[in-house]
Amino acid sequence: MARAGPEYREWNSELIKPKKLLNPVKASRSHQELHRELLMNHKRGLGMDRKPELQRVLEHRRRNQLIKKKEEELEAKRMQCPFEQELLRRQQRLNQLENPPQREEDHAPEFIKVRENLRRITTLTSEERAL
């Protein structure tokens, strides 16, 4: 098996000499500029682990929106007049009175509730007998 190397050119001058094919991607101007920019960033120490510019801009915008929203909420609380604050307090008090906190019995297991109901039934039947 003959090795195709530079020596084949020397002994046969009638052969067509191959030309190196151009890579269309590397030949494009934009690819060369991109490659040049990547090399410069690498030399300056800007790593590839950094986020893309679009992602950084979107995160920055989201962060600014959250900060703005929180500031608006705080400003709205500060701007409440004393009358509105008192109305809010009264509304909360009325809600507490209308919806009293559930008794501890409501959180008791089912068998305890049934047992208490049975006691009431037995006491009611004994009272009915007494009548």
UniProtKB/Swiss-Prot annotation:
GO terms for cellular component: actin cytoskeleton; cytoplasm; focal adhesion; glutamatergic synapse; neuron projection; nucleus; postsynaptic actin cytoskeleton; presynaptic actin cytoskeleton. GO terms for biological process: actin filament bundle assembly; actin filament polymerization; cellular response to glucocorticoid stimulus; cellular response to nutrient levels; cognition; negative regulation of focal adhesion assembly; negative regulation of G1/S transition of mitotic cell cycle; negative regulation of long-term synaptic potentiation. InterPro entries: FAM107. Residues 57-77 form a coiled coil. Its main location: nucleus. GO terms for molecular function: actin binding. A motif (Nuclear localization signal) lies at residues 61-71. Keywords: Actin-binding, Cell cycle, Cell junction, Cell membrane, Cell projection, Coiled coil, Cytoplasm, Cytoskeleton, Growth regulation, Membrane, Nucleus, Stress response, Synapse. It is found in: Nucleus; Cytoplasm, Cytoskeleton, Stress fiber; Cell junction, Focal adhesion; Cell projection, Ruffle membrane. Stress-inducible actin-binding protein that plays a role in synaptic and cognitive functions by modulating actin filamentous (F-actin) dynamics. Mediates polymerization of globular actin to F-actin. Also binds to, stabilizes and bundles F-actin. Involved in synaptic function by regulating neurite outgrowth in an actin-dependent manner and for the acquisition of hippocampus-dependent cognitive function, such as learning and long-term memory. Interacts with ACTB. Interacts with COMMD1; this interaction stabilizes COMMD1 in the nucleus. Interacts with MAP1A. Interacts with PRDX1. Interacts with F-actin. This is Actin-associated protein FAM107A. It comes from Rattus norvegicus (Rat). The gene is Fam107a.
